[in-house]
Amino acid sequence: MQVMSSARLHLKTAHSALTSARTRRWAGLLTSFLAGQGAVQVLNLITGFFLLRWMSIESYAQFSIAFGFQSMLQWLVDLGAVGSIVALVGNRGDDKEVVGKYIRSAKHFRLRLISITIPLAAIVFWFITSKHQWPLSLKILLFLSIIGTLCFQGWASFYSTPLLINQEIRRFYRPQIISSVWRLALCFILKISSALFAWTSAWVSTSAVAVHGLIYKRGAKPLVIEPEKSDPSANREMLHYLGPTIPWVIFTAFQGQISLFLITWFGQTRNVAEVAALGRIGQLFLILTVANSVVINPFIAKVPRAKLFRRYVQILGVSLGIASSLCLLAFLFPRPLLWVLGPKYMNLGSEIGWAVAGASAGYIGSVLLAMHNARKWIYWWWSGAHIVLLITIQIACLFMLDLSTTLHVLYFALITNLAALLILLTVGAYGFICGPPAKLA
């Protein structure tokens, strides 16, 4: 009996030590994430809100259209390939050749997509901006900055992934902090030099992406052995993973900026600046959205099936609580947020709560999407249902809302995000019942 009691005591002690070690590890990761993302978030918020105050309404509208267009193209030239690397590598993160193989496959697809997308994008960019009488030289400079950002963003996306796989959170955030300081400093220099225009701001952003992309590329060398050519089998595996999501990604690329593009087409330059400024308030959710890929995605990918439902509900519940609280505060106390936007936008008191509501719905959807991707709940019917429902609702909104006004564009964004959220909840229920598709299981 004494021997058995002693054995139980040793087992209990070992279990407690293991639990304590895991707790310390996750606490360390969470602390590093909050410190790193907090620093990046604060620096980017400061820069963004300084630009709101420093730039004229016309210059800010021009810069915002270029930024929105670049964000859309970033989705189109990636199609989720970079995000798929974590799921495809799985628990083989210590194998440098495996990580390098999938990075090379992601490059394979990105290079081909860029060569197709850029010529088409040039035509669309000219069409979108044709309503506004802006100089041709300005449009060319803005579009060239978009191309430059796309090229350098590839470095940042590919070579930051090995750091996430190995959960080296500090090394993941260091380059972003450096480039954020770089961007803020250059914007300040341009301001005091009276040279802060739309195109100069756009090129400063491009240079910041180049800085942290180069640092990532150098820092990832010890973690990756990248082949000279992509592996056809890895390409096929990645394509099987991405296939069901490609229609959704293409559609979402346009959806992400549709509010800005609609107000650009239907509204005036001031309306463009207002929608873009209110979009800055959505950055309240940026630190939480980044947590999807840095914390939630790797965590859910490793959760045992028996514990998945509980973890899923816990994460969803926390995200709902955070989003609801921020939304309520924005409606009840809009003045602090208006002060942050600056004196040019103090007339947006009735709009700011709706902007946060739309961002809240989008954030909750991003949490669900991160968990679904981590479990490989990627279905062809999901993309089709998502696209059909949203297009149907948006066509109805075109007839019901006055999209030349800032407030109605915000209503449009909120309704769209709620519809997308409904589809994602359906996907989650189906995933628990049926699991991932056979090709991805």
Task: Label each region the model flagged.
Residues 6, 24-86, 149, 243-270, ...:
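Signature of the first transmembrane helix
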Residues 23-46, 107-112, 143-147, 170-177, ...:
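Hydrophobic faces of transmembrane alpha-helices in multi-pass small-molecule transporters and flippases
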Residues 24-40, 66, 75-128, 305-327:
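Membrane-water interface segments that mark the loop-to-transmembrane alpha-helix transition
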Residues 78-94, 164-165, 282-306, 373-374:
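Helix-loop junctions and terminal segments of transmembrane helices
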Residues 127-145, 269, 332-360:
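Interfacial segments at transmembrane-helix termini and the short loops linking adjacent helices
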Residues 140-144, 173-222, 385-393, 404-431:
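Hydrophobic alpha-helical transmembrane segments
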Residues 150-174, 301-305, 357-384:
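Membrane-interface junctions at transmembrane-helix termini in multi-pass inner-membrane proteins
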